[in-house]
C-alpha cells in the first residue's frame, strides 16, 4: 500500500523527473566548491557574498594558530578549517542543481552549460590559488610588521 505524500514532500514522479534532468551533470560543481564568493553571484546566488567574512574569520584563526601556537588557537584553526571545507563541499553539491535549472530557464542547453562550468572550474582554481598565495604572503611578510 503506497502512502500519500505530505504537502511539502516530493512525489516519486517529481524525484524521477529531477534525476532525469540532472543526468550527465556532475554531482559536485568545482567552480562553486573552489570560489563560492565569486561563482555564486555570477550564477544568481547573491547570498554567497557571505563567504567573504567567513574567509576572513578563517584567515584570522589560521594566522592566530601560526603566530600564537597555543593549543586553543591551533584547535580552533583546525575546527574552522574542517568546517570551512564541509561548507564548501556542501555548497558545491547543492549549487549544481540550482545553477543547471537557472541555465536551463535561460535557454542554455546541457552541453553548453557543462562547457561553461568547465571554464568556471579552471578559472576558479586559478583564482583560489591566487587568493591562497596572496593571503600567505600577506600573513608571513606584511602582517607581522604592521603593528611593530
Where are these regions (language model features)?
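Membrane interfacial helix-start motif at the N-side
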Residues: 13-51
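Transmembrane helix recognition focused on a "late"/terminal membrane span
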Residues: 2-22, 56-148
